Curated annotation (Swiss-Prot):
It holds the Pfam family ACCA. Its EC number is 2.1.3.15. It catalyses: N(6)-carboxybiotinyl-L-lysyl-[protein] + acetyl-CoA = N(6)-biotinyl-L-lysyl-[protein] + malonyl-CoA. This is Acetyl-coenzyme A carboxylase carboxyl transferase subunit alpha. Keywords: ATP-binding, Cytoplasm, Fatty acid biosynthesis, Fatty acid metabolism, Lipid biosynthesis, Lipid metabolism, Nucleotide-binding, Transferase. Pathway: Lipid metabolism; malonyl-CoA biosynthesis; malonyl-CoA from acetyl-CoA: step 1/1. GO terms for biological process: fatty acid biosynthetic process; malonyl-CoA biosynthetic process. It comes from Mesorhizobium japonicum (strain LMG 29417 / CECT 9101 / MAFF 303099). The keyword ATP-binding applies. The gene is accA. HAMAP family: AcetylCoA_CT_alpha (MF_00823). GO terms for cellular component: acetyl-CoA carboxylase complex.
C-alpha cells in the first residue's frame, strides 16, 4: 500500500474512499457506484495536482525522503545493461552505501556510482541508509580512476542525507575520503553527469556530484546541511526545520535559479514515488541527450568543470 505523507491527507481520504467503493462493487455489496467512483477519481487527481503544484520547501523535503521513491538500484536496473559491480576500496573494506561499477547505457559503456538507501529494513541496514563511510568514497575514487584510464563517461546518482558521522568513520579518515573523492571528481578528463534523485546532503553528496552537468529531480533537495541540522545550529530549536528549509534554498527550482544545477527532471503528478518507471525513463532520456552533446563536443571536460565551479564561487 502507498505510504501517504502527512500533507497528503486530503488525497488519502479520497483514494481510500475510492478503494472502498471498488471493493464493495467487486463483492456485489453495492450497485451503481461507477459514476461516484469516476467523480471521486477526478476529485482525487485534481487535489493531488493542486497539492504538488504548490509544495512548500519543507514538503519537498518530505517527498525527497519518501520511502517509495525509486532508488539508485532501481535506476541501474531500469536504464543500464550488463552491469558489473565493483566492490571494496582495497584498503579497509566494502561499503554498500555506494553501489558502483561498469555497464552499458543504450549500447555505450559507462561507469556508474550511486548512493543506495535501501527499500526495506534488511536492505537499509545493509546499505547503511545511504550514509557513506570512508571506504565507500575510496571505492568511488577507484571507479573514477578506472573510468579515466579507460576513457569511459561517468554517471553518478546522488541520494544521501549525508556522510556517515560515526566514530569509526572519523577514525578511518572520513573528511579526507570526502575531500579526495571530490578532488577526483573534479580532476576527471572524461565527461561526467550527476543526477540528484532524492536527498543531496552536504559533503556526502558533493563528493560524487561535482560533475560537468548536474541535474535534479523536480522534488529532490540539495543542501549543505539538513533543515533539522540547520535549525538546531541557528535557532537551537529543531521545530523550526520548516523555516530552515525555506531559507536555505534547497529545492531544485531555487538551485536552478542560482545556477547551481543545470536542469530539472520533471516528476509525474504526485512525485516519483507514484510512477517510478516514468521518472526513470525521463532521467534516461536526459542522460542520453547530454551524452550525445558530449560526444559531439571538442571540449576539455576537466577545464570546463573547473570553470563551472569557479564561476559559482564568483557569483554567490
Amino acid at each position: 500500500m502507498y505510504n501517504y505523507l502527512d500533507f497528503e491527507k486530503p488525497v488519502q481520504d479520497l483514494e481510500l474512499k475510492i478503494l472502498e467503493l471498488k471493493k464493495l462493487a467487486e463483492n456485489g455489496e453495492a450497485v451503481d457506484v461507477a459514476d461516484e467512483i469516476t467523480r471521486l477519481e477526478k476529485r482525487s487527481r485534481d487535489a493531488l495536482r493542486d497539492l504538488y503544484k504548490a509544495l512548500t520547501p519543507w514538503q519537498k523535503v518530505q517527498v525527497a525522503r519518501h520511502s517509495d521513491r525509486p532508488h539508485c538500484v532501481d535506476y541501474i536496473k531500469g536504464l543500464f545493461s550488463d552491469f558489473t559491480p565493483l566492490a571494496g576500496d582495497r584498503n579497509f573494506g566494502e561499503d554498500q552505501a555506494i553501489v558502483g561499477g561498469f555497464a552499458r547505457f543504450r549500447g555505450e559503456p559507462v561507469a556508474i556510482i550511486g548512493q543506495e538507501k535501501g527499500s526495506d529494513t534488511t536492505s537499509r541496514l545493509r546499505h547503511n541508509f545511504g550514509s557513506v563511510r570512508p571506504e565507500g568514497y575510496r571505492k568511488a575514487v577507484r571507479l573514477m580512476e578506472l573510468a579515466d584510464r579507460f576513457k569511459i563517461p561517468l554517471l553518478t546518482l546522488v541520494d544521501t542525507a549525508g556522510a556517515y558521522p560515526g566514530v569509526g568513520a572519523e577514525e578511518r579518515g572520513q573528511a579526507e575520503a570526502i575531500a579526495r573523492s571530490t578532488s577526483a571528481c573534479l580532476a576527471l578528463k572524461v565527461p561526467s553527469i550527476s543526477v540528484v534523485i532524492g536527498e543531496g546532503g552536504s559533503g556526502g553528496a558533493i563528493a560524487i556530484a561535482t560533475a560537468n552537468r548536474v541535474y535534479m529531480l523536480e522534488h529532490a533537495i540539495y543542501s549543505v546541511i539538513s533543515p533539522e541540522g540547520a535549525a538546531s545550529i541557528l535557532w537551537r530549536d529543531t521545530t523550526r526545520s520548516k523555516d530552515a528549509a525555506t531559507n536555505m534554498k534547497i529545492t531544485a527550482q531555487d538551485l536552478l535559479e542560482l545556477k547551481i544545477i543545470d536542469a530539472i527532471i520533471p516528476e509525474p503528478m504526485g512525485g516519483a514515488q507514484r510512477a517510478p518507471e516514468k521518472v526513470i525513463a525521463a532521467t534516461g532520456d536526459l542522460i542520453a541527450k547530454t551524452m550525445k552533446e558530449f560526444a559531439g563536443a571538442n571540449t576539455d571536460f576537466r577545464e570546463q568543470r573547473r570553470e563551472k565551479y569557479l564561476a559559482m564561487g564568483r557569483s554567490l
